[in-house]
Amino acid sequence: EQIYSMLGISAEVEAFGNAVLKDLKERFEKIDAVAEYNQAKVLRAMQEERVDGTCFAGSTGYGYNDNGRDKLEKVYARCFGTEAALVRPQITCGTHALAIALSANLLPGDELLSPVGKPYDTLENVIGTVPSACSLMEYGVSYRQVELMEDGTFDYPAIREAINEKTKLVTIQRSKGYAMRPTFSVQQIGELIAFIKEIKPDVICMVDNCYGEFVDVIEPSNVGADMIVGSLIKNPGGGLAPIGGY
């Protein structure tokens, strides 16, 4: 009490703060449990891939025999439950990672669908909704999006109608980004993917996982996503990595 009074904080404010902390105790405990689980998951992946001191040796950038890079990608694949992973410092940000994923999987004549409304502003130039050189639309890829319902949920009838024979890839932005809509849980994304796969089993379901890594004990790749994309600058880098993506 004396410490708070020295800072000019009244007993009433201190009591209010303690009451709020008590109300949030259960929530904080759940967050701590998720963090502990994911820490153990990462450590186990490193053990299974036998990460050792040699993996942290400097690299000339030459592609062959880069043991650290190879094992890092195997660790990521284990953590996210995928067949493989591409994790590189040469990927500068999440938008760069998404651009790589989209351009690698879409050809002229294919169609890209966003069932969660407009994606990040930075992707507009990549897709071509804002005219840009070498965009997907300039390359011959068409694009359509389905807006969310007023309550922020998926418009399933409109999504069903939007999927057609040209739909090659569906991109699902997990984070709300800069929009006034909810951030989707892994469970919600899993339900959406299952719905889409029932309509067109061979469509590629890609999740923009930026800001979503390790906030749950499962990832979108554990509930049907064919590909997840993100940035090392955010959650995976712990706020320390200045660059990188997967």
Predicted regions and their residues:
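Conserved PLP-enzyme active-site core in the AAT-like
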Residues: 3-25, 32, 42-48, 52-55, ...
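Aromatic- and Gly/Pro-rich donor/ligand-binding loops
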Residues: 58
